[in-house]
């Protein structure tokens, strides 16, 4: 077993993998497409976070192609941007495209069931309360004793009247918070909304949802 024997040292490891695939699609010596498929094949089911050279991606106009290719791979769970300042500086509209098209909504971290897959219990006593600071949705942390069943943060979703409750839709996430309250955007008390709160453990296993309908 050597540092280059990827298929050997990954097996049995409790880890995720961040591989540096800095080249572009079509590079003769190191094709991004070929390398991505290779890593997917030998990742042993571990989540992959692809290291991407933003300058190269922008230079060859391959942002959309690389995103589409990554989305085809079931265990590619994210991207490591190198270097991040290029995205912040919005070189080639890279950062704008991320915010507008790919990363528009909040996201939960990828799950790692090979470490722990048991979800925490649901939040308790979810209740909207009028306070001097406005209309607040409060809840109580679920009971948990060990690191793998204690809630570390919560997800707050909002659905309009008549909408199907679907916590797999990230556009409905209003907040991921470590607080046990959320300030509601009260308007005139005429419109019904259903707020959903779930608990996350430190590996982001998500509890069953708790619903509360309020008029805002």
Regions flagged by a language model, labelled:
Residues 1, 21, 35-66:
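Active-site clefts of carbohydrate-active enzymes
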Residues 2-12, 16:
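Single conserved hydrophobic/aromatic residue that forms the stacking wall/gate
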Residues 17-19, 48-52, 78-82:
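Hydrophobic faces of well-ordered beta-strands that scaffold small-molecule active sites
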Residues 22-27, 54-57, 84-88:
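Solvent-exposed loop/turn segments at secondary-structure junctions
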Residues 98-148, 204-216:
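Pro/Thr/Ser/Gly-rich low-complexity, intrinsically disordered linker/stalk tracts
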Residues 142-168:
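Solvent-exposed loop/turn segments flanking beta-strands in beta-repeat/beta-sandwich domains
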Residues 177-183:
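Short S/T/G- and acidic-enriched coil/turn segments that sit immediately N-terminal to beta-strands
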Residues 184-206:
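Beta-strand-rich modules
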